[in-house]
């Protein structure tokens, strides 16, 4: 396989889908060497089969707003690959949703799910419906109308959606209720459910906890630990909050937190009491992080990100493309030797190159934030067993999964000079499991 030739063919076949082409390009560039060690893959034209989704489903969603007007949105489900398990991936409700974005996300989800070591294929779906500014009743009516179409395409052994941007516990609950009404069946057809009807303990904490477990494993490769390390954390939502919580439990000192207006720097560290304030501020009061600075008398920098502060470790947990090339150089100059992504794709490609050229520890979110989808998989297991595991059981299983993801990244990402390229390791590890399953199942 020549990655460039495959990409050119896909560009011609799927014009006007830049997000999808970019995602495929990034993965193919890192797996090309390993792929070419297996001539049987090329004979089966495996890479083209893997790059094209099994199916893309598009449907109309009509619903009535509070003024009695009929609204129409587009709904999608991209079922990318089910070689290792039922299709699994979130539903996104956002005005930017289109086929290209969902194809890109489903492609990425296939490898991310493979990395978790759990039997889950890859999918993604959603709608161009925007829940912001809508009443609860409007959101409920839309979710019910959306499920009126989606229910035909999903099932516990076929396709199990979850939440994503614009789809939280409220939306999952509305869709689950409608599925139950339509089918007269109580099944684990969605994850991210409430604890009262089949949800899992640790699910809210999972992405943040898993991020720190992976970070801990990375540090061990250099004889280091989290004890006493100063950590820069961006964001102040779910992932950032539970990243900070687990950092504290393992002896680290998180010193920053941010939102879209700016960041706070607390040289004494964000302790358990201060974290409780952040959780109350963000989850209940919906306030701004500036209020933390006002309460505790620490530095607040408006319209900036925390990457200019001195620290040992950085973990971006806010949003896409939040570390650029210049910020990456600043982080290294200020003593940062490890970066673990809590958010999805928060580091720009040029910044990743800076980290790798400097030989610091860097892991992409595909591996380090896989704890969320891993715990969704554990929710599926509990639903199948008709059991609910304890908090300790789920946390132990999550920790073991993150350890195994790290081991696979090391296996496939270790360079001849001993440096661990976690980007390559994550992509190759995820790819190889899916590729071997596809080969075993024949041409279909």
Curated annotation (Swiss-Prot):
The species this protein was found in: Xylanibacter ruminicola
Function: Catalyzes the reversible oxidative deamination of glutamate to alpha-ketoglutarate and ammonia. P.ruminicola possess both NADP(H)- and NAD(H)-dependent activities on the same enzyme, suggesting that both anabolic and catabolic forms of the enzyme might occur.
EC number in record: 1.4.1.3
Active site, renumbered: 124
Keyword NAD found: yes
Residues reported to bind NADP(+): 207, 238
UniProt keyword annotations, A-Z: NAD, NADP, Oxidoreductase
Site (Important for catalysis): 164
GO cellular component: cytoplasm; cytosol
Subunit structure: Homohexamer.
Disulfide links within the chain: none
Record protein name field: NAD(P)-specific glutamate dehydrogenase
Gene3D superfamilies: Glutamate Dehydrogenase, chain A, domain 3, Leucine Dehydrogenase, chain A, domain 1, NAD(P)-binding Rossmann-like Domain
GO molecular function per UniProt: glutamate dehydrogenase (NAD+) activity; glutamate dehydrogenase (NADP+) activity; glutamate dehydrogenase [NAD(P)+] activity
């Amino acid at each position: 396989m020549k990655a460039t030739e495959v990409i050119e063919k896909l560009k011609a076949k799927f014009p006007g889908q830049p997000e999808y082409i970019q995602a495929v390009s990034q993965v193919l560039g890192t797996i090309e060497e390993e792929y070419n060690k297996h001539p049987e893959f090329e004979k089966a034209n495996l890479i083209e089969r893997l790059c094209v989704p099994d199916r893309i489903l598009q449907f109309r969603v009509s619903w009535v707003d509070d003024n009695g007007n009929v609204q129409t949105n587009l709904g999608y489900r991209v079922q990318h690959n089910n070689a290792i398990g039922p299709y699994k991936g979130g539903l996104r409700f956002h005005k930017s949703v289109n086929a290209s974005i969902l194809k890109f996300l489903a492609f990425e989800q296939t490898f991310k799910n493979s990395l978790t070591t759990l039997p889950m294929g890859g999918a993604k779906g959603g709608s161009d419906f925007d829940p912001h500014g809508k009443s609860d009743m409007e959101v409920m009516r839309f979710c019910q109308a959306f499920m009126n179409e989606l229910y035909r395409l999903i099932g516990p052994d076929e396709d199990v959606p979850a939440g994503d941007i614009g789809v939280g516990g409220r939306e999952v609950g509305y869709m689950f209720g409608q599925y139950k009404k339509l089918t007269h069946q109580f099944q684990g057809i969605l994850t991210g459910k409430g604890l009262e009807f089949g949800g899992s303990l640790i699910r809210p904490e999972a992405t943040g906890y898993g991020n720190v477990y992976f970070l801990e494993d990375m540090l061990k490769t250099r004889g280091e630990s989290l004890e006493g390390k100063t950590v820069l954390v961006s964001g102040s939502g779910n992932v950032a909050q539970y990243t900070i919580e687990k950092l504290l439990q393992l002896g680290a000192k998180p010193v920053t937190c941010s939102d879209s207006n700016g960041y706070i720097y607390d040289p004494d560290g964000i302790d358990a009491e201060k974290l409780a304030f952040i959780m109350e501020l963000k989850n209940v009061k919906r306030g701004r992080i500036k209020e933390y600075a006002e309460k505790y008398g620490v530095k607040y920098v408006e319209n900036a990100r925390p990457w200019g502060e001195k620290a040992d470790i950085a973990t971006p947990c806010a949003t896409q493309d939040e570390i650029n090339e210049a910020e990456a150089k600043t982080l290294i100059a200020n003593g940062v030797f490890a970066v673990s992504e809590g958010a999805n794709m928060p580091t720009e490609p040029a910044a990743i190159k800076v980290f790798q050229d400097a030989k610091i520890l860097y892991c992409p979110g595909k591996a380090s934030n896989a704890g969320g989808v891993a715990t969704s998989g554990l929710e599926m297991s509990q639903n199948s067993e008709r059991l609910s595991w304890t908090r300790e059981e789920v946390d132990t299983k999550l920790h073991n999964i993150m350890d195994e993801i790290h081991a696979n990244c090391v296996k496939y990402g270790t360079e001849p000079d001993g440096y661990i390229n976690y980007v390559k390791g994550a992509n190759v590890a995820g790819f190889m499991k899916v590729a071997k399953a596809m080969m075993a199942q024949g041409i279909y």
